[in-house]
Amino acid sequence: FDLAIREANASGKYPYKVEMVALDDASDPATGVAAALKLVSDPAVVAASGHWNSPVALATIHIFHTYKIPFIVWGAIHPDITGFYKYPGVNRVAPTLIQENGPLCDWVIGELGFKNFSIISDTSSYGEMNLKAFRPMAEGKGAKILSVDSVTVGTTDFRPILTKVKGLNPDAVYFGGVVMEGALIRDQMEKVGLKKLFFAISGIKDDKFLEVAGP
């Protein structure tokens, strides 16, 4: 984003200079709302872009819509951001989690041949929507869901859940959530002897996942 702004300014095509104002939403809806309110209160702000975290985006889009500030979502993938509210000034360049879960489901069932799954999802709007997306997709392809467990964001000890899941002997464990909880689950799967495939969509794609979960 910063590179695009610098290139636009260097091109000489525009009779003005574009300035980027970067604020940290901390992947927290309340922090994101505070940042959005700060931006829309500045008359020099003409457009905005964000977020990585879906619950944050779902909290801020109403502010940008109310203040008529065009808003482009670059990372958050909850479908309701654009699919439910349909604010004309809110658009996305990222796919939705439904679009991500489809190919993932095709791969793990169609290509790997796995049929029995345990699901762990967090209780955020992002996690709940992943559960709602993946489960019917998998069952529609003939898969069996052996267990579903919901966890709060910030949970650090998943061993009781994983020990139960180990006894069910699924082919794989699907996770609907983001980096830290996903990494801890993957790490603790090894520690309880649950040597099965762990898989999820792009919410876990971060160097921190590999750092915590290990190879």
Where are these regions (language model features)?
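Signal peptide-proximal N-terminal region
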Residues: 1-20, 139-143
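Residues that mark the start of a beta-strand
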Residues: 19, 115-116, 171-172
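A structural preference for short, hydrophobic beta-strand core positions in alpha/beta folds
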Residues: 20-22, 147-150
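Short, well-structured alpha-helical segments in soluble
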Residues: 22, 29-46, 106-107, 156-169
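Extracytoplasmic ligand/sensor domains, especially the bilobed periplasmic-binding protein
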Residues: 30, 44-148, 197-215
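Hydrophobic alpha-helical
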Residues: 54-65, 170-192
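Internal alpha/beta domain cores that form substrate/cofactor-binding pockets in large enzymes
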Residues: 145-149, 161-164, 168, 181-196, ...
